[in-house]
């Protein structure tokens, strides 16, 4: 039986909650002597769901680096949620200095309002993607449904957990990873579409974000397989040793979370310089190794190869360029009336 969680389709309510949270942060900054009046520079990083633990570790690393190097204290304030909803919260007034979101398209939505300068993709290395991931399966111990690849997910006795592409950037990557498999195995577009329809017919719970889907599968014990960020699957196995297994499909997609300075906010807050250093530091050796420890693939190829035991480097990975970039992909698959709406019966 399919279930779309109530908060998933109550998108406006979700956005209001995120906006209220961001406004509380803003009030704190204003009433708590602002960004600098107590001697502490504060910046806000609006990020997506599965990065919580990574940035909890990264922020103290950066704060120490900045104080040791420049003699000034920095405090990084975090906000997390579904990537699409997070982007909309910034558009609607959340006072983010930087965004670290699940996909380029979400940052482009902010750019289109003028809050982020054009050309942000080239401001940092690797198209402003300091770490990457891919999409894998998380199954229960012993893999009771014998899931090995995408075609196993369309079996009638398999319940699939994946978030909603309308609110979750990770869910968009999940969709494209599955479609990449379909493209490998079906030359005809109608057959590819039918495969996707069958897959999403097996989705029993669709949360608004990747972390919500992980909670549904791991903590609430619903479903047979979770379509997940690789880093989220790795984290789940560490948190619940012996209870879950990671299955690498034959075909997936190179998921590239993106980062950017919210230029208008950072300029108004006087944090442009700190914000730039905050994102630049993600590319340092220390930060790249930290990303790997938290299940993200370092953009530094040398460091990535050192973690060959953690990451399957032999998966056939499509890229967003294979879909004509995010603008084209959104138009074809995720906009109102596009493929996802056609195949998924709400």
What are these regions (language model features)?
Residues 185-250:
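Ligand-binding pocket segment of bilobal, Venus flytrap-like solute-binding proteins
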Residues 36-167, 314, 344-345:
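N-terminal segment of the mature folded domain
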Residues 129-134, 196-200, 207-208, 239-272, ...:
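Periplasmic-binding protein-like
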Residues 266-346:
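Extracellular/periplasmic juxtamembrane helices and adjacent flexible linkers that interface
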Residues 29-32:
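C-terminal motif of bacterial Sec signal peptides marking the signal peptidase cleavage site
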Residues 142-148, 167, 180-188, 265-273:
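Short helix-loop capping/hinge motifs at secondary-structure junctions, enriched
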